[in-house]
Regions:
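Active-site-proximal cap/loop segments of hydrolase catalytic domains
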Residues: 159-165, 237, 241-244, 248, ...
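Gly/Ala-rich beta-loop-alpha elbow adjacent to hydrolase catalytic centers
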Residues: 125-133, 149
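Catalytic nucleophile-loop/oxyanion-hole region of alpha/beta-hydrolase
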Residues: 67-74, 88-122, 137-140
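Short, surface-exposed "cap/lid" segments of acyl-processing enzymes
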Residues: 48-81, 87-90
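Alpha/beta-hydrolase-fold enzymes
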Residues: 135-236
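Structural motif
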Residues: 53-54, 122, 148
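N-terminal cap/lid segment of alpha/beta-hydrolase-fold proteins
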Residues: 3-53
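Residue-level detector of conserved catalytic or cofactor/ligand-binding positions
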Residues: 256-264
Length: 264
């Protein structure tokens, strides 16, 4: 790594660490919305003249989808340094559900983007989105377009993750951090099963509002109030997501990439 590249990397990391609230709007970054050929909402962030590379940034389990404030800040920062960021909202993850259709759509977006710009497209994935990125990078239709993959917090096996969720439901949280995680897991599982669960209408509205702000704006006191009012007396069985084994396998990088003959 040359010295100038090292300095650019330092500047990029510093800008990411500042957060959106401490970063001034950048007039050189252009944002425009598009729909993929199959109709998935996508926002593209790019520098008005500096275009060094292109990547697709994949969100995790968040009902904000590609509009998660942290992901927007990441995309704007990357664009500031010349990396065009394509940010889709994947329907399954944005609904707190585990759906293999997200993999198909992500692969389609990568292929469509690469064909459009006639250049390779990298993948950057966060949390569950990181695991999806790894799986898609091993697919034959997308593999040739993806020169690199970067993930943050990806899992290896979805069944193990959900088993951990189930075990956590049986434990009494011992500190603020554990409470924060326990409440979040319950909200995600409940929201993902909203079509099949009887729950007060005002509770659904409060739950959605809380989930949208959970990781960046909602206070711990607000989270505990919601838990005490709506979640405390619910049977823990309600919170257990139950994807079919076939779905678990397809959404697990450990298994989903097992047949890939190329190095990822």
């Amino acid at each position: 790594m040359g010295f100038s590249t090292f300095l650019k990397l330092q500047a990029l990391l510093a800008r990411l660490a500042w957060g959106a609230s401490r970063t001034c709007p950048d007039p050189s970054v252009i944002e425009h919305q598009k729909c993929s050929p199959s109709g998935t909402r996508t926002v593209i962030y790019q520098h008005h003249h500096r275009k060094l590379a292109t990547c697709v940034a994949v969100h995790g389990v968040t009902i904000n989808g590609g509009q998660d404030p942290r992901l927007i800040h990441f995309a704007r920062t990357m664009a500031h340094f010349g990396v065009t960021c394509v940010v889709p909202t994947l329907g399954g993850l944005a609904s707190c559900r585990w759906e293999t259709s997200d993999l198909d759509e992500l692969a389609n977006i990568v292929t469509f983007t690469a064909d459009t710009i006639q250049q390779p497209v990298g993948l950057v994935g966060f949390s569950f989105g990181g695991s999806y990125a790894l799986i898609v990078a091993g697919r034959s239709e997308a593999l040739k377009h993806i020169p690199w993959v970067i993930t943050f917090g990806a899992y290896h096996n979805l069944a193990d993750v959900l088993e951990g969720y189930a075990l956590n439901l049986k434990r009494e949280p011992q500190n603020k951090t554990e409470w924060d995680e326990a409440i979040y897991q319950r909200l995600v599982c409940l929201y993902g099963q909203r079509d099949a669960i009887t729950f007060p209408q005002e509770g659904w509205q409060e739950l959605e509002a809380l989930l949208r702000r959970y990781c960046s704006e909602a206070s711990f006191e607000e989270k505990r109030r919601f838990y005490n009012h709506y979640l405390h007396d619910l049977d823990t069985e309600v919170f257990k997501p139950l994807p079919e084994p076939e779905v678990l396998n397809k959404l697990s990088p450990e298994i989903g990439r097992a047949s890939c003959r190329e190095r990822v």
